[in-house]
UniProtKB/Swiss-Prot annotation:
One of its GO terms (biological process) is tRNA N1-guanine methylation. One of its GO terms (cellular component) is cytosol. InterPro entries: Alpha/beta_knot_MTases (IPR029028), tRNA_m1G_MeTrfase_C_sf (IPR023148), tRNA_m1G_MeTrfase_TrmD (IPR002649), tRNA_m1G_MTases_N (IPR029026), tRNA_MeTrfase_TRMD/TRM10 (IPR016009). It catalyses: guanosine(37) in tRNA + S-adenosyl-L-methionine = N(1)-methylguanosine(37) in tRNA + S-adenosyl-L-homocysteine + H(+). Pfam families: tRNA_m1G_MT. The keyword Aminoacyl-tRNA synthetase does not apply. Its EC number is 2.1.1.228. GO terms for molecular function: tRNA (guanine(37)-N1)-methyltransferase activity. The gene is trmD. S-adenosyl-L-methionine binds at residues 117, 137-142. This is tRNA (guanine-N(1)-)-methyltransferase. It is found in: Cytoplasm. Keywords: Cytoplasm, Methyltransferase, S-adenosyl-L-methionine, Transferase, tRNA processing. The keyword Repeat does not apply. The lineage of its organism: Bacteria, Bacillati, Bacillota, Clostridia, Eubacteriales.
């Protein structure tokens, strides 16, 4: 996968893109990353990238010209671009809130271009002409789009095949299936009077899976209950959710397993 970032502070990406999972993905050739300095595409003498807003108001607005030229250099002519293979994303508070589902969607692209704004934003003609979608990482204001871009990159890269040492890690993390992740423990089993759950020490794989699933329901209900609203659950999960709620001190009825319907036209054996 190729990821390009447009920013006036490319040096902000030097450390985070060189270490841990992202750094290893680059070393393996799984990820190609470039941070492009928007100032390099300016045509004015002083390499200015901003000007006062039309209509007045506080702050400065980033010019369209350097972004247009940078995007054309990276992606080629607008009219020839295939949005199914590459996508241009503007990081902005006005965008849709980023999610694990969106990260998985973006990880299937060949190329992702992230635009980092500053000041009062970017001339809207950039959005109209080039941007495929707008993404926000939450309902709060940051100084620029660089930190949100790093969040998106981290979430996307870890989903690329081969990026993680254990491919099951991404499948079991929070939000991978709409639930928060279960609690984790490691050695020693007894630490300062606090014991690790016996289920995790039993060696019984089915019991471990059941405990983890139930704890995921507990944690989700306690911290993000909205994730459970309207969620269709198979019967086994319905039982685990009810047990989890009971263990939290709530009144929940354990569902009974539905009886199989007898096929029509067949008489019961005597």
């Amino acid at each position: 996968m190729k990821i390009d970032v447009l920013t006036i502070f490319p040096e902000m990406f030097t450390g985070p893109m060189d270490v841990s999972i992202i750094g290893r993905a680059r070393e393996k050739g799984i990820l190609s990353f470039n941070a492009h300095d928007v100032r390099a595409y300016t045509t004015n003498k002083h390499r200015r990238v901003d000007d006062t807003p039309f209509g007045g108001g506080a702050g400065m607005v980033m010019n369209a010209q350097p972004f247009f030229d940078a995007l054309a250099a990276i992606l080629g002519p607008r009219e020839l671009r295939d949005p199914l293979r590459s996508r241009v994303v503007l990081l902005t508070p006005q965008g849709a809130v980023f999610s694990q589902a969106k990260a998985r969607e973006l990880s299937g692209l060949q190329q992702l271009v992230l635009i980092c704004g500053r000041y009062e934003g970017i001339d809207d003609r950039v959005r109209q002409a080039w941007v495929d979608e707008e993404i926000s990482i939450g309902d709060y204001v940051l100084t620029g789009g660089e930190l949100p871009a790093m969040v998106v990159i981290d979430a996307v890269v870890r989903l690329l095949p081969g990026a993680l040492g254990d491919e099951t890690s991404a499948e079991e993390e929070s939000f991978s299936d709409g639930l928060l992740e279960y609690p984790q423990y490691t050695k020693p089993a007894l630490f300062r009077g606090m014991e690790a759950p016996p289920e995790l020490l039993s060696g019984h794989h089915a019991a471990i899976r059941r405990w983890r699933r139930k704890e995921a329901f507990k944690r989700t209900y306690q911290n993000r209950p909205e994730l459970l609203i309207g969620r269709p659950l198979p019967f086994d999960d319905q039982v685990l959710l009810a047990e989890a709620l009971r263990e939290l001190g709530l009144d929940a009825e354990i569902p009974e397993k539905p009886k199989k319907k007898r096929a029509k036209g067949r008489e019961p054996r005597t």
